[in-house]
Curated annotation (Swiss-Prot):
Protein family (similarity comment): Belongs to the RNase HII family. RnhC subfamily.
PANTHER family assigned: RIBONUCLEASE, RIBONUCLEASE H2 SUBUNIT A
Natural source organism: Staphylococcus aureus (strain MRSA252)
Enzyme Commission number, as recorded: 3.1.26.4
All residue ranges annotated as the RNase H type-2 domain in the record: 95-311
Gene3D superfamilies on file: Ribonuclease H-like superfamily/Ribonuclease H, TATA-Binding Protein
Function: Endonuclease that specifically degrades the RNA of RNA-DNA hybrids.
Name of the gene this protein is made from: rnhC
TM spans (from-to): none
Annotated localization: Cytoplasm
Record's cofactor remark: Manganese or magnesium. Binds 1 divalent metal ion per monomer in the absence of substrate. May bind a second metal ion after substrate binding.
Stated name of the protein: Ribonuclease HIII
Major localisation: cytoplasm
Pfam families, per the entry: DUF3378, RNase_HII
Taxonomic lineage from the root: Bacteria, Bacillati, Bacillota, Bacilli, Bacillales
Length: 312
């Protein structure tokens, strides 16, 4: 299935929507309109990007956006020639892969989120066009924009270990490695249930532990172990991991924004000195129990926040 993406102005989007009939209700978050035309799905996103999906995507895009279609083809050719780094096509991007990654493990506030995502060879060009990259190189705004598009066409499973459950498991002796192993394994299994596994070439996990450690903590067998690989700095080696990273980071960012609204103060990410100060303010204004409900209790920030309050 071909996928073609364009970035259009508001004027061009209005023109496009006047050419065929679009649905504008009951759409996924981040999507403005959707249409089915000549066996091709046309999605218009709030970001101004338009995606054509289907075996006739190229022909339909040329019919509906003749000028833009030609420009996009020329730009793609120039970009591929001029920027060989974009075409690193590290092994995994030549195959159909499930990638998995997590967010929030190094942050005092907020949950631990894990995502597994299935990316096919056919997805690779569109993901590069959308600007999918290592999430560490992307702003929160860009991550939200990308994730709201990715979840509409990438088979995935997103799991969230909220702070209350996280703290209970940690008190039972669960390390973060164990939590992540269990969540990654579960998310991967969930994705396998959504796809034809005969089409899968590899499962690529952004490595946070060696295979034997992961296997020990996962609580259940690794599905398709012969196809499973562990990669350090996986986001830069596999677009499947990059997609999983963006979606898991999106879930974490969204939750952090909600926490900030609930307590009427901006909650910082990470585990630095700014976090200690905000944690102390939360204790003072809402109590230690409220702090514990939105944070990872075993981090040193909790103790440091209490020390900040002692002189007061």
């Amino acid at each position: 299935m071909a996928n073609i993406v364009f970035k259009l102005s508001d004027k061009d989007i209005t023109t496009l929507m006047s050419r065929i009939s679009f649905d504008t209700e009951n759409l996924p978050q981040g999507m403005k309109a959707r249409a089915k035309y000549q066996n091709t799905t046309v999605n218009i996103y709030q970001s101004g990007k338009v995606m054509f999906q289907g075996n006739h995507a190229e022909a339909v895009s040329e019919e509906l956006l003749p000028q833009h279609s030609q420009l996009n083809t020329n730009k793609t050719k120039k970009k591929n020639t001029a920027n060989s780094s974009l075409e690193q096509t590290l092994m995994y991007d030549q195959f159909n892969c499930i990638g998995s990654d997590e967010a929030g493990s190094g942050d005092y506030f907020g949950p631990l989120t894990v995502c597994a995502a299935f990316v096919t060879k056919e997805h690779v060009p569109i993901l590069k066009t959308l600007g999918v990259d290592d999430s560490k190189k992307l702003t929160d705004t860009k991550i939200v924009e990308l994730a709201e598009q990715l979840v509409t066409f990438i088979p995935h499973s997103l799991l969230t270990l909220h702070n209350e459950k996280y703290n209970i498991q940690q008190a039972k002796g669960w390390t973060q490695v164990k939590m992540k192993a269990v969540l990654h394994n579960e998310a991967i299994k969930n994705v396998l249930e959504k796809i034809d596994s005969s089409q899968l070439d590899y499962i690529v996990i952004d490595q946070f532990a060696k295979r034997e450690v992961y296997s020990h903590y996962a609580l259940s067998d690794i599905p398709l172990p012969k196809k499973t690989k562990f990669e350090t700095k996986g986001e830069s080696k596999s677009l499947a991991i990059a997609v999983a990273s963006i979606i898991s980071r999106y879930a974490f960012i969204t939750y952090m924004d909600q926490i900030s609204k609930n307590i009427n103060m901006t909650i910082p990410k990470g585990a630095g000195a700014k976090v200690d100060v905000i944690a102390a303010k939360i204790i003072k204004n809402y109590g230690i129990s409220r702090l514990d409900s939105i944070s990872k209790k075993h981090f040193k920030n909790r103790e440091k926040a209490q020390k900040i309050l002692k002189p007061l």
